[in-house]
Amino acid sequence: PVEIIIVGALKVGIKDTDIIRINVYFAGGINFEEGIWFDASIVDSEIVGIKLEGDMAFRLFWGGNTKGFLLSIGGFHPNYTPEEGMLVSDMKRMALKLDYKVLKVGLEAYLAVTSNSFQIGAHLDICVGWNKFGIRGYAGFDALFQFDPFLFMFSIEAGVSVVCGSWKLLSIDLG
């Protein structure tokens, strides 16, 4: 069997500034008898002060022991395990992070489509304040739709709290 593999890096930026700095490392290959695979990771990247990171995977297998399709940007639903033959390891969520002294915002998300499922989810964390005092909030959801056997799962969570030192003065959690 003939297999072609490509490995590389993509770097995007504006010289002498940190306005845009994107680093993507990737590897992919094709085995003409079995299928195509491609993986990419965004690392040490930033756009206008917003940090970026995350993983992506693509698989299309038509021969060999595993047959099927998989596209994931940021991983999978927490209750989903890809087929062993798809050769997908732990993936980092696609993430945007803003980190200032008084404001911290983090958004993590994933989207996955496989031969047998559709998955989407996101989680948002916000902190306004200082180390010892502030308001913290979060919200998130996860959805999994599987065709065979039929399965639909959806969960949602949200909460907010006021903290002072190591004490939670007030909190509301849903989910």
Map each language-model feature to its residues.
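Extended assembly/interaction regions that build large supramolecular complexes
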Residues: 1-175
